[in-house]
């Protein structure tokens, strides 16, 4: 598959050929379910001309049916472009196909999608990760040059790691969220999934920057990174020892091999611990579900999307939501409503916000001593479908990614090794706020070390 770096240099006629070849390949691999069009046996959405970029189904593309993979949004057609889509089009890139995801980005496997699950290209019996599982699977399988996803608690990084791709979550506020179907507004961030660090930097440069339409968008000057990538920078890297030691043996062994390579390459390695990740889990699921219960209250059958047959307004609300939302979305909305309710707000929500401030401070203290933090992406390689059927077990699969969202920091996942079954193991690199260049340089250097370049 051609790289994004090379694709943007193609002539118009070559881009047309590339798009046709991709369409044919997508049709031939329908069983993967990376695109909604594969799951619904329909033609790929491709009416915009340019270098094709796969788009997660919660990012608005004008005149496309954008549903966040939920039954409740069936029939909705986006009346406008998300800011990131406008930036793609301006740069000569174009949205190409709607990638599958967990319903409203709530999940880690794509199994909660209304359309059906996506298979992991490395092993069809295993999950691709989530919620951006379709984007990661499409890139991994060569069905996309690159893709956009969204990351609320690891939803770009975890599927990228499970499928063997590079997944980059920028600093919160660096990329506009205007036009992103909101799950948790203080945590959500759009970012790229690609096959290389260089392509991730290129796509990030295109979509980043201030947007007056997004009140949380930073107005700091956005400096390009891809033209400054430096794999030879010597950095101080803090290895989060208790997180590495807490991962599976395969992940642990692979990451310590990576640490040895980084030492040999001249990087300064220090070892640090973070507080027990159970605090991250508790704070994240209180804050995220509280914000989700507010964000998803707009889906009531009145303004847009699916409306259930009913005899009264109250019945319409309850039936529309009961029939339109999946089990996991209902679970999180109920939890969010509970923690915001009178009598529990102080006990849960306020405490969670205090815990979030503590978690952010912990990350900042380590990053005052180091340029980069290194830790696992997930406790293990991609697991089999149905293996984590208990919701709590599934939530714990995100223990190494959610703290980054709570702290609002940039982070990237880089494939470093395959296990004996051919499943990918990735390292997660985290940098200080607004220091995307540090993160991308570290990732670029690690990628070259791993490949032996």
Swiss-Prot record:
Record field: catalytic activity: L-glutamyl-tRNA(Gln) + L-glutamine + ATP + H2O = L-glutaminyl-tRNA(Gln) + L-glutamate + ADP + phosphate + H(+)
A biological process term (GO) from this entry: translation
Enzyme class, spelled out: ligase
A single GO cellular-component term on record: glutamyl-tRNA(Gln) amidotransferase complex
Any Pfam family hit: Amidase
Active site per database record: 56 (charge relay system), 131 (charge relay system), 155 (acyl-ester intermediate)
Keyword ATP-binding belongs to the record: yes
The EC number(s) this enzyme carries: 6.3.5.7
Sequence intervals crossing the membrane: none
Keyword Ion transport part of the UniProt annotation: no
Keyword terms, alphabetized: ATP-binding, Ligase, Nucleotide-binding, Protein biosynthesis
UniProt similarity note: Belongs to the amidase family. GatA subfamily.
Stated role: Allows the formation of correctly charged Gln-tRNA(Gln) through the transamidation of misacylated Glu-tRNA(Gln) in organisms which lack glutaminyl-tRNA synthetase. The reaction takes place in the presence of glutamine and ATP through an activated gamma-phospho-Glu-tRNA(Gln).
Subunit record text: Heterotrimer of A, B and C subunits.
Name listed for the protein in its UniProt record: Glutamyl-tRNA(Gln) amidotransferase subunit A
Organism taxonomic ancestry: Bacteria, Pseudomonadati, Campylobacterota, Epsilonproteobacteria, Campylobacterales
UniProt gene name: gatA
